[in-house]
């Protein structure tokens, strides 16, 4: 579970940011936004 949350914590943790790429962060935020959007529209 920590691996999935690392990109979310990356902007707030330099250690996590060093292990993850901007692309990974973008993908995770896109997925979170998509799921959140679907939940809000129902």
Swiss-Prot record:
It is found in: Virion membrane. This is Envelope protein P10. The keyword Zinc-finger does not apply. It is a single-pass membrane protein. Disulfide bonds: none annotated. Involved in cell lysis. The lineage of its organism: Viruses, Riboviria, Orthornavirae, Duplornaviricota, Vidaverviricetes. GO terms for biological process: killing of cells of another organism. GO terms for cellular component: host outer membrane; membrane; viral envelope; virion membrane. Its main location: virion. Keywords: Cytolysis, Host cell lysis by virus, Membrane, Transmembrane, Transmembrane helix, Viral envelope protein, Viral release from host cell, Virion. The chain crosses the membrane at residues 20-40.
